[in-house]
């Protein structure tokens, strides 16, 4: 039973959080979301396209970060849980071996009392279940008003400066549902696949998220 539960948990994690497959959606209530698109047309035929994107939805409050402004609670509890899980696994292997091999007093101790460490590890895992406060939505000024503002301002600045690109279309795409597994942009991409992939127009997308101080900026050119 334990192995089955572990497999199911890992399967859901890989499918939802690594591959972004939406196979769990039937279990949740459907709600309406919105994507917004602004387009600045070029001079002449559209041969190239630049899409600047930011997501409009905000995450629920993360308790460990909110209350850990002076003490790194997230790092502490993650270290507790991950470190404890590794040690618990090692102790479990030793306890199993001790059942078949005489390891003296040490082996007897592992068989009879190693469960105490498993219990301590479980306590650390419980703290992670309390990570998200589903009753409070974070204001989202950083994540991700900064991204949506940058996308909209790009078009606004081009307009104010009177810049009209030749054959290059510039778009501001504001998506919903990013915090819910990229559902907004995935839905938009599915509905506009032919328009943007099969149209023959070279398209590049710049996704802007959490645009903060320069020393913290990172540029990713592939899936993290």
Residue positions per predicted region:
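Short beta-strand-to-loop junctions in surface cap/lid or active-site-entrance loops
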Residues: 37-46, 54
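Glycine- and small hydrophobic-enriched segments that form the cores of compact globular domains
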Residues: 46, 57-60, 68-71, 145
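Acidic/histidine-rich catalytic neighborhood of metal-dependent amide-processing enzymes
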Residues: 4-37, 58-63, 95-119, 124-224
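Short intrinsically disordered coil segments
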Residues: 51-56, 67-69, 222-223
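C-terminal single-pass membrane-anchor helix
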Residues: 86-90
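Structural motif
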Residues: 48-51, 203-204
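Cytosolic-side membrane-insertion boundary helix
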Residues: 3, 61-85
């Amino acid at each position: 039973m334990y192995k089955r539960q572990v497999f199911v948990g890992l399967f859901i994690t890989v499918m939802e959080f690594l591959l972004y497959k939406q196979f769990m959606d039937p279990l949740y209530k459907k709600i309406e979301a919105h994507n917004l698109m602004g387009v600045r047309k070029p001079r002449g035929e559209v041969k190239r396209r630049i899409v600047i994107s930011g997501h409009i939805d905000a995450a629920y409050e993360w308790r460990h970060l909110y209350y850990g402004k002076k003490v790194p609670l997230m790092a502490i509890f993650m270290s507790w849980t991950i470190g404890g899980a590794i040690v618990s696994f090692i102790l479990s292997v030793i306890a199993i071996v001790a059942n078949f091999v005489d390891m003296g007093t040490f082996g007897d101790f592992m068989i009879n009392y190693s469960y105490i460490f498993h219990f301590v590890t479980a306590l650390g895992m419980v703290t992670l279940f309390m990570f998200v406060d589903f009753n409070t939505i974070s204001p989202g000024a950083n994540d991700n008003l900064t991204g949506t503002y940058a996308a909209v301002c790009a078009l606004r600045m081009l307009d104010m400066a009177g810049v009209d690109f030749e054959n290059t279309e510039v778009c501001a795409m504001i998506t919903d549902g990013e915090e819910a597994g990229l559902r907004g942009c995935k839905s938009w991409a599915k509905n506009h696949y032919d328009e943007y992939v099969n149209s023959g127009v070279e398209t590049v997308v710049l996704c802007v998220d959490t645009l903060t101080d320069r020393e913290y900026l990172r540029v990713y050119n592939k899936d993290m």
